[in-house]
Amino acid sequence: MNYVNIVEKSKNFIELELVNDDHSLSNLIKEVLLSKKGVILASYGVEHPVLDPDTGRYISNPTIMLKTDEKTDAEKVLKEALKDIVDLCNKTLKEL
């Protein structure tokens, strides 16, 4: 089963669905995307969540939407943002 599904993709727009997640990762990705040059819109939406009986967490399938200007490739910006998040996690692990 995929954790990430591509809902829609073009040069300047990408929409992803994160399967069985909540606000945490979606909000982090959105915030990092908004700091990137060429980003016009970075947003996410979460339908009404349900309680996962196995974890006790409220989960849904949030969608992340990214729109960039004509000169900026949306997939490239998304990959840069995800790399920044991984780098931040690695830096935090080293400092612990």
Curated annotation (Swiss-Prot):
GO MF annotations, alphabetized: DNA binding; DNA-directed RNA polymerase activity; protein dimerization activity
Entry's EC annotation: 2.7.7.6
Keyword field: Cytoplasm, DNA-directed RNA polymerase, Nucleotidyltransferase, Transcription, Transferase
One annotated Gene Ontology cellular component of this protein: DNA-directed RNA polymerase complex
Subcellular location: Cytoplasm
Catalysed conversion reaction: RNA(n) + a ribonucleoside 5'-triphosphate = RNA(n+1) + diphosphate
GO terms of biological process kind: DNA-templated transcription
InterPro entries: RBP11-like, RBP11-like_dimer, RNA_pol_Rpb11_13-16kDa_CS, Rpo11-like
Role: DNA-dependent RNA polymerase (RNAP) catalyzes the transcription of DNA into RNA using the four ribonucleoside triphosphates as substrates.
Family label: Belongs to the archaeal Rpo11/eukaryotic RPB11/RPC19 RNA polymerase subunit family.
HAMAP family the record matches: RNApol_arch_Rpo11
Subunit (UniProt): Part of the RNA polymerase complex.
Protein name: DNA-directed RNA polymerase subunit Rpo11
Native source organism of the sequence: Methanococcus maripaludis (strain C5 / ATCC BAA-1333)
